[in-house]
Amino acid sequence: DLDHFKMVNDTHGHLVGSRLLSEMGDALKTNCRLIDFAFRYGGDEFVILLPQTSKENAIYVAKRLHKLIRETVWLTKEGLDIKITPSVGVASYPVDSKTKEGLLHLADEAMYLVKNTNRDSVAAANLGILPENSDAEEAAGEAAAQ
Protein backbone atom coordinates (compact mmCIF):
# COMPACT_ATOMS: atom_id res chain seq x y z
CA ASP A 1 0.00 0.00 0.00
CA LEU A 2 1.33 3.45 -0.90
CA ASP A 3 1.51 5.92 1.98
CA HIS A 4 -0.42 9.18 1.50
CA PHE A 5 -1.29 8.30 -2.10
CA LYS A 6 -4.44 10.43 -1.85
CA MET A 7 -2.17 13.47 -1.57
CA VAL A 8 -0.71 12.65 -5.02
CA ASN A 9 -4.22 12.61 -6.50
CA ASP A 10 -5.24 15.77 -4.62
CA THR A 11 -2.07 17.67 -5.58
CA HIS A 12 -1.47 16.51 -9.14
CA GLY A 13 -4.81 15.05 -10.26
CA HIS A 14 -6.09 11.54 -10.83
CA LEU A 15 -4.39 11.16 -14.21
CA VAL A 16 -0.98 11.63 -12.57
CA GLY A 17 -2.03 9.24 -9.80
CA SER A 18 -2.94 6.64 -12.43
CA ARG A 19 0.40 7.15 -14.19
CA LEU A 20 2.21 6.69 -10.89
CA LEU A 21 0.36 3.42 -10.23
CA SER A 22 1.20 2.20 -13.74
CA GLU A 23 4.89 3.12 -13.38
CA MET A 24 4.94 1.48 -9.94
CA GLY A 25 3.45 -1.73 -11.35
CA ASP A 26 6.04 -1.78 -14.12
CA ALA A 27 8.87 -1.29 -11.61
CA LEU A 28 7.58 -4.09 -9.39
CA LYS A 29 7.30 -6.50 -12.32
CA THR A 30 10.77 -5.55 -13.58
CA ASN A 31 12.27 -6.24 -10.15
CA CYS A 32 10.72 -9.68 -9.69
CA ARG A 33 11.68 -13.06 -11.11
CA LEU A 34 9.97 -14.51 -14.18
CA ILE A 35 8.02 -16.97 -11.99
CA ASP A 36 6.70 -14.20 -9.69
CA PHE A 37 3.43 -12.32 -10.10
CA ALA A 38 3.15 -8.61 -9.33
CA PHE A 39 -0.19 -6.91 -9.82
CA ARG A 40 -2.39 -4.10 -8.59
CA TYR A 41 -4.95 -5.50 -6.18
CA GLY A 42 -7.11 -2.41 -5.79
CA GLY A 43 -6.74 1.30 -5.15
CA ASP A 44 -3.08 1.85 -4.34
CA GLU A 45 -2.44 -1.71 -3.15
CA PHE A 46 -0.25 -4.22 -4.93
CA VAL A 47 0.15 -7.95 -4.35
CA ILE A 48 3.30 -9.86 -5.18
CA LEU A 49 3.22 -13.65 -5.27
CA LEU A 50 6.60 -15.35 -4.89
CA PRO A 51 6.24 -19.07 -5.68
CA GLN A 52 8.84 -21.46 -4.29
CA THR A 53 10.10 -18.81 -1.86
CA SER A 54 10.74 -19.21 1.86
CA LYS A 55 9.30 -16.66 4.27
CA GLU A 56 12.84 -15.45 4.97
CA ASN A 57 13.48 -14.80 1.27
CA ALA A 58 10.02 -13.24 0.84
CA ILE A 59 10.89 -10.80 3.63
CA TYR A 60 14.17 -10.01 1.88
CA VAL A 61 12.30 -9.32 -1.39
CA ALA A 62 9.74 -7.17 0.44
CA LYS A 63 12.50 -5.09 2.02
CA ARG A 64 14.31 -4.74 -1.31
CA LEU A 65 11.13 -3.58 -3.09
CA HIS A 66 10.30 -1.27 -0.19
CA LYS A 67 13.72 0.36 -0.57
CA LEU A 68 13.28 0.61 -4.36
CA ILE A 69 9.93 2.39 -4.01
CA ARG A 70 11.03 4.83 -1.30
CA GLU A 71 14.31 5.75 -3.06
CA THR A 72 12.88 6.20 -6.57
CA VAL A 73 11.84 9.60 -7.85
CA TRP A 74 8.69 8.84 -9.84
CA LEU A 75 7.29 10.39 -13.04
CA THR A 76 10.43 12.32 -13.95
CA LYS A 77 9.66 11.78 -17.66
CA GLU A 78 6.47 13.79 -17.10
CA GLY A 79 8.48 16.60 -15.49
CA LEU A 80 7.43 15.65 -11.97
CA ASP A 81 9.52 14.57 -9.00
CA ILE A 82 7.23 12.46 -6.84
CA LYS A 83 8.58 10.65 -3.81
CA ILE A 84 6.35 8.10 -2.09
CA THR A 85 6.79 5.42 0.53
CA PRO A 86 5.10 2.04 0.91
CA SER A 87 3.69 0.18 3.89
CA VAL A 88 4.34 -3.50 3.23
CA GLY A 89 2.84 -6.66 4.75
CA VAL A 90 4.23 -10.17 4.21
CA ALA A 91 2.56 -13.55 4.74
CA SER A 92 3.89 -16.91 3.62
CA TYR A 93 2.35 -20.20 2.51
CA PRO A 94 2.13 -22.63 4.28
CA VAL A 95 3.88 -21.14 7.35
CA ASP A 96 1.24 -18.48 8.06
CA SER A 97 -1.81 -19.83 6.23
CA LYS A 98 -2.76 -22.54 3.78
CA THR A 99 -5.48 -20.53 2.01
CA LYS A 100 -5.25 -17.54 -0.31
CA GLU A 101 -7.86 -15.72 1.77
CA GLY A 102 -5.85 -16.35 4.92
CA LEU A 103 -2.63 -15.16 3.30
CA LEU A 104 -4.22 -11.95 2.04
CA HIS A 105 -5.82 -11.33 5.43
CA LEU A 106 -2.53 -11.82 7.31
CA ALA A 107 -0.55 -9.72 4.81
CA ASP A 108 -3.21 -7.00 5.17
CA GLU A 109 -2.98 -7.18 8.97
CA ALA A 110 0.80 -6.83 8.80
CA MET A 111 0.48 -3.91 6.39
CA TYR A 112 -2.04 -2.15 8.65
CA LEU A 113 0.31 -2.64 11.60
CA VAL A 114 2.83 -0.57 9.63
CA LYS A 115 0.17 1.96 8.54
CA ASN A 116 -1.04 2.45 12.11
CA THR A 117 2.42 2.97 13.59
CA ASN A 118 5.07 4.70 11.52
CA ARG A 119 4.27 3.84 7.86
CA ASP A 120 7.17 3.45 5.40
CA SER A 121 8.21 0.02 6.65
CA VAL A 122 7.77 -3.75 6.28
CA ALA A 123 5.94 -6.08 8.66
CA ALA A 124 5.44 -9.83 8.48
CA ALA A 125 2.67 -12.01 9.86
CA ASN A 126 3.57 -13.25 13.34
CA LEU A 127 6.82 -11.22 13.36
CA GLY A 128 5.63 -7.60 13.47
CA ILE A 129 7.50 -4.63 12.03
CA LEU A 130 10.92 -5.58 10.73
CA PRO A 131 14.16 -3.57 10.93
CA GLU A 132 15.84 -2.43 7.75
CA ASN A 133 18.54 -4.72 6.36
CA SER A 134 22.16 -4.13 7.21
CA ASP A 135 24.68 -4.24 4.35
CA ALA A 136 25.65 -7.81 5.37
CA GLU A 137 21.99 -8.91 5.30
CA GLU A 138 21.60 -7.28 1.87
CA ALA A 139 24.54 -9.27 0.50
CA ALA A 140 23.30 -12.54 2.04
CA GLY A 141 19.78 -11.92 0.72
CA GLU A 142 21.04 -11.18 -2.78
CA ALA A 143 23.01 -14.43 -2.80
CA ALA A 144 20.01 -16.44 -1.53
CA ALA A 145 17.62 -14.88 -4.06
CA GLN A 146 19.65 -16.02 -7.07
Residue ranges and their predicted role:
Residues 10, 50-53, 70, 93-94:
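Residue-level recognition of strand-loop junctions within catalytic nucleotide-signaling folds
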Residues 30-35, 67-79, 111-113, 117:
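Short catalytic/binding micro-motifs of nucleotide second-messenger systems
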Residues 37-40:
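A short pre-motif secondary-structure segment
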Residues 84-86:
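PAS and PAS-like sensory/regulatory domains
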